[in-house]
Each structure stands twice: as C-alpha cells, then as structure tokens.
Amino acid sequence: MKNSSIILVLVFFFFISSSGEAKTCSDGWTCVGEDKCKVNCMAKHKGVGTCTLYIIPSFPAPITSYICDCMFDC
C-alpha cells in the first residue's frame, strides 16, 4: 500500500508539472524589415519576430522571399 501511494503521488506530481508548460506557436507574413517584423510580432502575439530568407526550388530559377517568423507562447 505504501509503494502504490508513492507512485500515485509521483504520477500526480508529473501530471501537474507537465500540464503548466506553455506551447510555442508561430505565425508568418511577408517581411518588410527586421524592425517592423519585431514590432508587429510583439503587437499581434507578444512574441519574437525574425526575418528569414526562404528559398523555394523551382525551374528555371528558385523563388526567394523574406518571411517574418513570429514565435510566441500559445
């Protein structure tokens, strides 16, 4: 009985501690400047925005675009 009580307490503690973690979500839009990306991300989601260059392979030339990657807690 004593061992099962300890296991029950440990399982309960693990469940409570893991349920409180924030998940990370993301949003993205066309980047019009690093500073504007950071400001818009903070205003929309209270997150951190970074301009990232994405290269999409295509023929005859690859397509490149800058996207504002906004990472925030859900």
Curated annotation (Swiss-Prot):
Residues 1-22 form the signal peptide. Its main location: secreted. The keyword Secreted applies. Keywords: Antimicrobial, Disulfide bond, Fungicide, Plant defense, Secreted, Signal. It is found in: Secreted. The keyword Disulfide bond applies. GO terms for cellular component: extracellular region. Disulfide bonds join C25-C74, C31-C51, C37-C68, C41-C70. GO terms for biological process: defense response to fungus; killing of cells of another organism. Belongs to the DEFL family. This is Putative defensin-like protein 186. The lineage of its organism: Eukaryota, Viridiplantae, Streptophyta, Embryophyta, Tracheophyta. The gene is LCR40.
